[in-house]
């Protein structure tokens, strides 16, 4: 996000106590804003959006009925909650732009990976409450999970507001900021891990003779059903594996090969690598990708 112009589509007087400014109309910004409307915690007319790309923000506003503002600062001034949904590399310029407009009554919610609440507070230079959030890609279908943590000035009421707003795309959990990089490595990147395994499963099905579309359908529903066993059936992952694995059976042979191939170690190493990268980004204060 850079300082830039956008257009006002709705000039009606709005209650700034309930307006939410979403600065950054990229994929995740759109998903979160749409989730607020879908869950009923805000109407489309209470969502103010901006983006450095005029065409993109017009498309998003038109699709959902959001309000466009002429600048980031104007959106902040007309809102009590501000969601920072830009890439980490664009955050310093955005913070510098909006800092004069941010006051003690604002709640700032940032989804920028690798940017600490302390860095956000320094960049804003004021007394606003800051909450850091880590959603994931499954939020687009209302099945995400978002972890939030409070900055030094955020109170429980601020976390409650963040939970309410972000809850439209899935469950919200509160954690200490020390855990946020681990959350990034597990759930933030997690959909990609499962997708990679599913991709390999589909290819494997084709290898043993299934038509690709049949293999893809089998894998997708098997993933959905397995997730339901864990979330709705209250089974531990190890219990699911044990329940399916008969002594000397086909699943037992398959699990043996997966273990021989180092799948478990590969997962551990992958999550560690993601965690280390998240720490590297956080070490840069405002991060970059």
Question: What are these regions, as identified by a protein language model?
Answer:
Residues 186, 198, 284-287:
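Catalytic, metal-anchored helix/loop core of enzyme active sites in primary metabolism
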Residues 119-129, 145-182, 195-232:
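Internal alpha-helical scaffold of NAD(P)-dependent oxidoreductase catalytic cores
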Residues 2-70, 74, 206-207:
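NAD(P)+-binding Rossmann beta1-loop-alpha1 motif at the extreme N-terminus of oxidoreductases
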Residues 48, 54-55, 64, 72-148, ...:
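Rossmann-like NAD(P)(H) cofactor-binding subdomain of soluble oxidoreductases
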Residues 47, 57, 75, 120, ...:
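Small-residue helix-packing motif on alpha-helices
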Residues 5, 9-15, 220-289:
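NAD(P)-dependent Rossmann-like dehydrogenase/reductase catalytic/cofactor-binding core
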